A protein has these predicted regions:
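Terminal accessory/targeting
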Residues: 89-198
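Single conserved hydrophobic/aromatic residue that forms the stacking wall/gate
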Residues: 1-7, 11
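Extended hydrophobic/Leu-rich segments
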Residues: 10-16, 26, 72-73, 93-96, ...
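Short Gly/charged-rich anion-binding patches and loops
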Residues: 6, 28, 54
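His/Asp/Glu-enriched short active-site or ligand-binding loop at hydrolase and phosphoryl-transfer sites
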Residues: 12, 32-42, 50-95, 105
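Alpha-helical scaffold elements lining the catalytic groove of polysaccharide deacetylases
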Residues: 9-37
Length: 198
């Protein structure tokens, strides 16, 4: 199993880079794969998990079948096949207990995520919200994030079908991740999301 990624640190240097620069970087990566292996992988991993709608369109145009971000969660039938979640299984997060737990999780399916673009240019205007497809999961739902750099629980405002982060929620610049879970009938459900605040 071989997956491709970008050729350089263009994402790291300029997370809000224009799509043409990113496309050129991916094409360089594909060229190198062809030179070294004789084929171009049809799986892709977004560097640092960052992907706007425009970048996802590039991935589709390059005939990449599926791609992964760096947001945690199980895959569902509603997942964007060109921006799927995953769990890291490595030396820091790879013990058998974590693997067993991660593989047993059910997807917490959400709709109408706002803002829809993960790239946030003004955190003062950020009001993060989403709708939960299975309303039975709202009561037990809790969210955690590193929105200020440290992992903490997030105050939520819930109604019958949607969840809104409290107005008191604070955000700092950088790559920020959000994980929401809910336990129902003895099973855990998980939704992960990533944003990049400039």
């Amino acid at each position: 199993l071989v997956k491709s990624s970008a050729a350089s640190d263009v994402y790291k240097r300029q997370p809000f880079n224009n799509v043409e620069n990113i496309k050129e970087d991916i094409l360089r990566s594909q060229k190198r794969f062809m030179e070294e292996l004789g084929f171009v992988p049809d799986l892709f991993a977004f560097p640092f998990g960052e992907a706007s709608e425009n970048v996802i369109s590039i991935i589709k145009d390059l005939n990449i079948k599926s791609a992964f971000g760096q947001h945690s969660g199980p895959i569902s039938h509603k997942s964007n096949i060109h921006y799927m979640p995953r769990f890291s299984i490595n030396e820091n997060f790879g013990d058998i207990e974590r693997f067993t737990f991660s593989s047993s999780l059910k997807p917490l399916i959400v709709n109408n995520i706002k803002p829809s673009d993960m790239f946030i240019s003004n955190s003062k205007l950020l009001n993060f919200s989403f709708e939960v497809q299975n309303k039975k999961l709202i009561n037990g739902l809790q969210c955690f994030g590193n929105l200020t750099g440290e992992w903490t629980s997030i105050d939520l405002i819930k109604n019958k079908s949607s969840v809104l982060f409290s107005e008191q929620t604070t955000y700092k610049e950088g790559r920020r991740r959000i994980n929401c879970t809910s336990k129902f009938n003895g099973e855990w459900y998980w939704f992960g999301h990533q944003i990049l605040i400039k």
